[in-house]
Amino acid sequence: MRIRSFAPQLPLVKLAAIVKKTLLRSWALLGMGLFAACAAWAQTPAATKAPLVIAHVAPTSGRFALHAEADRRGAEMAVEEFNARGGVLGREVVLVARDPTLDKARAAQVAQQLITESKVGFLLGAIDSGVAASMSAVCQQYGVLFINTNSSAPSEAVENAHRSKFSFDANGANFNRALLQYALAQRPGKRVVLLTEDNDWGRSNAAASRAIVAEYGGSVVGEVMVPVALPDPAGALRQVAAMAAEVVAVNVSGSNQIRLFAHIDPAVFEAQSWVVGEVDWEELYPAPGTPRPLYGTTWAWNLDTPGTAQFVARYRERYRHTQRLPYPGDVTHAAYLATKALLSAIERTGSTDNHALIRALEGMRWSARERMQHDDAFMDPVSHHLQQTIYIATWKPRPDRPELSQVILGHLPPAQVRYAPEGGARLEPLAAMPHYAP
């Protein structure tokens, strides 16, 4: 059964109308018995019960547009997998798309409309950490589960954590713990300059980086704060060069990374250790000739881990008609497994009740095989943040075969990259949350 994906720019009233009209048309066709295959499907519970609607929310324009597409593909693959075997609890899963934009106030409005007007069952996506914080706060008010697939501010698992939100990406603190420890060990001097994007994500990662630098015997000697629009990447790099330091810790996101590193001479990486908290495949593959320093990721399409080759083959078959992102990256991988975790929790509990699902997700553990990684993973019940393998990688440009440019240098288990402040997260009491059973 194909996923019904709706244009993200549609107003919510139209979106709800389209969902209703589409479903009524499907049921009418089944009732008329126009197709034998549809008649056979009509005998299954998924055809007679109301569909389970999940809203995929990710900014489809701006510096995260490609990330949003990759995230949606991962969610689609999981939904299609469950629908192929009859849906969930006898209900077809329908994925609808809505653009929350990169404006936090607008994102909150979109969440409110999806819940109160379109009556969706769950929200999934985000990409941008400010959007995730804004939308998940609204979801918490209504008791609607928010599955944060791919935003990586450490604050998502501490001050912006919620009982109804589960975060499936590693955060910048996890990546920077691995990267800064390595970089500081390679240099006799331990002076660090921070290059930070001036938004929730950047500031949260910079704050975590300061503590990590101090822990490993370094000192932060300066910080260059750049606007989100990154109007002058070369100017920002000149400011960094003016500071004497052995390590440069970069927390710049999305396509801004491409614009920044396009201005860097690769020889700079020999004189200094540069690290980037997280680099997604969507910032690498579109600019294969751009030099990159060390960075962190959670998965790569060419990992020699159980299940990876099969997942890549499914992806390439499913999206063979597209020119963009012919290979899946960490964003697609995270969204696929996050969506699968939600749907599996519904199957295991036999319910869509939010209280039951929260309890199930809080206790979930995954084997390394299930995660296509090197280590087992688990959902931290205190912070609702997935603890998983972190990979240290670099980019050796191969413009002729860009998919082969990424080189995995090593990996660390969850215990070695854990962000200690998550232990102090304060989630709302489950008993105080309204029940919601879509």
Q: Language model features by range: what are they?
A:
Residues 2-3, 15-17, 23, 35, ...:
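Extracytosolic ligand-binding ectodomains
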